[in-house]
Regions:
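Residues that define the transmembrane beta-barrel architecture of outer-membrane proteins
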Residues: 10-14, 100-105, 121, 163-167
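Outer-membrane beta-barrel pore domains and translocons
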Residues: 21, 32-34, 128-132, 174
């Protein structure tokens, strides 16, 4: 039987930015956030297989996780059994995780120079980065993922990749 155990839609999402200038330097940052919503961690379904798949390495448990060993144990994972036939890794609410995050989407640091002796009013040199850091408790690669293949659950399934981290160098000239 099935039961509703959360929603993939966040309760609140958005972004904010800041720009600072000091002498000839400028710094700007853009953040994005999401609060609420559950993510189905498909990678855990595949790799936290509790011995079901004999052809794959088994995932090391994270701090605070434990395996069932004897009756009465309260554990986050079933017992690991080589060639496990118990289907311990079928779709389960244990693969649902909080989708909250705060992401540093972009950060740019620039320096402005006046080069009027060469006919240049301003030259700005800058370094920029995108998708630099994500603060989250989600154990997967990236909590900001599309729903896979029109699925009703938001999951980092096969064929989905996290946002690419980029680093750039730039030069702006004003004549």
């Amino acid at each position: 039987s099935y039961y509703k155990c959360g929603s993939a839609s966040p309760d609140l999402f958005g972004g904010f930015n800041t720009s600072l200038t000091w002498k000839n330097f400028d710094l700007s940052a853009v953040f994005g956030y999401s609060i609420g919503g559950k993510l189905y961690n498909y990678a855990r379904l595949e790799y936290d297989s509790d011995g079901t798949y004999t052809d794959r390495n088994q995932m090391k448990l994270q701090d605070g996780w434990s395996r069932w060993e004897k009756p009465g144990d309260i554990a986050t994972h079933p017992a690991a059994n080589y060639g496990n036939k118990s289907q311990a890794n079928i779709a389960s609410s244990r693969y649902l995780e909080d989708g909250d995050y705060l992401k540093l989407r972009s950060l740019t640091l620039g320096y402005n120079l006046k080069l009027t002796q060469w006919g240049i009013q301003n030259m700005r040199v800058y370094l920029a980065g995108e998708n630099l850091f994500t603060w989250t408790k989600y154990s997967g690669l990236d909590p900001e993922i599309p729903a896979s293949n029109g699925s009703v659950m938001k999951t980092a399934g096969p064929g989905l990749y996290p946002s690419v981290r980029k680093f750039m160098f730039g030069l702006n000239l004003t004549f």
